[in-house]
Amino acid sequence: CPRIYSDSYIMMEAMGHRLDREVERNFVEAQQKGLENDAITEYIDQHVLMENVLKTTMADFDGGYVVCGLTGSGEMFSMRDPWGIRPAFYYKNDEIVILASERPVLQTTFDLEYEDIQELQPGCALLVRSNGEAVVKRILEQRGDYACSFERIYFSRGSDQDIYNERKKLGEQLTPQVLKTIDNDIAHTVFSFIPNTAEVAFYGLLRGFKHYVNEQKIKRIEALGRIPTHTELEDILHDYVRSEKVAWKDIKLRTFITEGNARNDLAAHVYDVAYGSIQPGVDNLVIIDDSIVRGTTLKESILHILDRLHPKKIVMVSSAPQIRYPDYYGIDMPRLEEFCVFQATVAL
């Protein structure tokens, strides 16, 4: 759309108008105090409160955002939406104030501990006065806790402590469904992941299956009702979860943000497989994906490539919640019918 109709442009116009009103308020106060000329200008610079500007501006805006800005007088501000859709973390001491959308960036850059970094709460703003004072002010009342799940699942750095544990848990929770699909035949099932960002969820899935296998070993030993022989014990302990690096991504490309016609052509050349990694016609192949959006790569490339290994069964699982609605996280996905979940529902 034309630039003048974009949300950022409208927000800047509204904020500029409110800033003018804040300057006007201080101008009147300065005159009432008997100040003139340069003294009025200095008074305005020292008394403009960005929290007043934000309170009157941001109440009219909807959706997820972290807005950052700088005024001509040196006031800096960062504000998070009251629904908590977009993430924001900050660190401040006597020398620096810094804000980012992800905690690991701050930890790595400034060698900080997890506990050193604060989350900017929904509806709050981090303000840096022109004199260097940094404060956090409540601008709008919190209206919910609706963190963007797609950002946490796909875009966020997997090195974040919370994100890492979440992704592992999402993978582990798939254990019962996968067991049912493979008829509990772990001995003839190989586990792998696609794409590379699904690796953490893959470890979670493996953890779930390792727990299951260990429980089965304990039950088999207890069922003997006696001390097992060396051969029996060796047979029981031989059961394990098989994992392989089956798929290899040749180029670092994300097909879901590629333009329509180029997307299908690109998807067919993204992956290759490790030949000989499974027993043809004998092994099931379980592949975990961390986010299936349109399913373009899945349909155009992955399933065809995996089939070259001749597995007994291919099981595709996704650790992500279903992506059901357009314009998710602002990505250009305007049509509902593009989504893999929508197409699968219609097919069923």
Regions found by a protein language model. Name each.
Residues Y9-K33, Y203-T229, I331-L348:
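Internal, charge-rich low-complexity segments
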Residues E42, T57-M58, S73-E75, R80, ...:
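PRPP-dependent phosphoribosyltransferase catalytic core
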Residues C1, F191, A198-L205, F209, ...:
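Extended, hydrophobic alpha-helical segments in both membrane/secreted and soluble proteins
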Residues C1-Q121, L127-T189, I194-P195:
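Conserved short alpha-helical segments that host acidic/polar catalytic motifs at enzyme active sites
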Residues M76, I85-P87, L106-T108, A134-V135, ...:
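Flexible loop/turn segments at secondary-structure boundaries
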Residues N37, S149-D162, E244, W248-T258, ...:
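Gly-rich Lys/Arg/Thr-decorated short loops/hinges at beta-loop-alpha junctions or inter-strand turns
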Residues G132-C148, F193-E232:
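Terminal amphipathic helices with adjacent charged low-complexity linkers/tails
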Residues D60-G63, E166-A187, V200, L205-G208, ...:
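Phosphate/ATP-binding catalytic cores across multiple sugar-kinase/actin-like superfamilies
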